[in-house]
Amino acid sequence: TLEYVKGSHKWGLQPPKGEFHSPDDYKKELNNFAKKNNKKIEITYVEVPAGGVAFHHGYTWHGSGMNYSEDHRRAIVAHCVPHDAKFHPNNKGGTAKIYKKYKNSDSDQLDDKFFPLLWKNNK
């Protein structure tokens, strides 16, 4: 079951301060942020069946609880960003640790080899 925090996409960029993948308490940072910033936490639960797809805004606080089953939990993730997206110059923590290996050393532009253009809107 996927968990989304309702309205959290409006809270702005909030990079995780600690461990991003498989932390001991996956809601710790959410609870700390909400308390510090007087935000209400309202969780919406979304059951994504095998073969199903879920989409969400990149700022949305999301996650899932522990997998207590004997089965592995598998997922494929695709991050879709606008064609003019750039690496954030001040985002050094959280997921930046994961994605910094895709950054060009001489630019904040996304590298086409890792972030290919999927569609173009011809207005």
For the regions a language model picked out, list residue spans one by one.
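Double-stranded beta-helix
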Residues: 1-61
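Non-heme Fe(II)/2-oxoglutarate
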Residues: 17, 53-55, 59-123
